[in-house]
């Protein structure tokens, strides 16, 4: 690879690091080209899966201000640069790794810090942002309905008391 090509590749990878909301670093030793294509399809629009030389990736990470990933760049390494929801991409990679034992998750990077294998797996086990927001909204709606019932209860109790007193007076006057 010519020096100019390397500089271009480093700049491209650094740009991907900067634009990504998260990255997942994997080892793809033993996977076929068809397997890699299948993984890329499963990631869809949420992430791009890139295979690059470790030395170029290390330089690009340093250029992008990413620290703590150098030890992950050994052996055949590929990186998923996540543009969408990190949970969706992590789920897709974890599911693919479960089917294809050759794919090994090495770690990742999100919100300014390196992630361990366990942290990437925990992110994959989370529900998507939309599901969590829906659950939160449902919980809030239920609590708001209870609060409205509590606030309305004294008024309705007063109204029932007034109606009972009115009936009692009407009964006393009739007698």
From Swiss-Prot:
For this protein, the record's InterPro entries field holds: Ribosomal_uL10 (IPR001790), Ribosomal_uL10-like_sf (IPR043141), Ribosomal_uL10_bac (IPR022973), Ribosomal_uL10_bac_type (IPR047865), Ribosomal_uL10_CS_bac (IPR002363)
The family database entries (Pfam families) matched by this protein are listed as: Ribosomal_L10
Identify the domain of life.
Bacteria
For this UniProt record, the keywords arranged alphabetically read as follows: Ribonucleoprotein, Ribosomal protein, RNA-binding, rRNA-binding
GO cellular component: a single term: large ribosomal subunit
A Gene Ontology molecular function term for this protein is: large ribosomal subunit rRNA binding
Swiss-Prot/TrEMBL GO biological process terms: translation
User: Does DNA repair count among this protein's keywords?
Assistant: no
Q: Which family does it belong to?
A: Belongs to the universal ribosomal protein uL10 family.
Q: Which PANTHER family match?
A: 39S RIBOSOMAL PROTEIN L10, MITOCHONDRIAL
What is its biological role?
A: Forms part of the ribosomal stalk, playing a central role in the interaction of the ribosome with GTP-bound translation factors.
**NCBIfam families, A to Z:** PRK00099.1-1
Its name, as the record gives it, is Large ribosomal subunit protein uL10
Q: Which organism is it from?
A: Mycobacterium sp. (strain KMS)
């Amino acid at each position: 690879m010519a020096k100019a090509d390397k500089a271009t590749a480093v700049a491209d990878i650094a740009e991907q690091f900067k634009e990504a909301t998260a990255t997942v670093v994997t080892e793809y030793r033993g996977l076929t080209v068809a397997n890699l294509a299948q993984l890329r399809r499963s990631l869809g629009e949420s992430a791009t899966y890139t295979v690059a030389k470790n030395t170029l990736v290390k330089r690009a990470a340093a250029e992008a201000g990413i620290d703590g990933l150098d030890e992950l760049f050994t052996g055949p390494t590929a990186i998923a640069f996540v543009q969408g929801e990190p949970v969706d991409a992590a789920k897709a990679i974890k599911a693919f790794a479960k089917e294809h034992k050759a794919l090994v998750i090495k770690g990742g990077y999100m919100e300014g810090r390196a992630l361990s294998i366990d942290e990437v797996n925990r992110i994959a086990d989370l529900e998507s942002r939309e599901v969590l927001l829906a659950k939160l909204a449902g919980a809030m709606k239920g609590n708001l309905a209870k609060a409205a019932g509590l606030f309305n209860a004294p008024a309705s109790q007063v109204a029932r008391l007034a109606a009972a007193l009115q009936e009692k007076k009407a009964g006393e006057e009739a007698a």
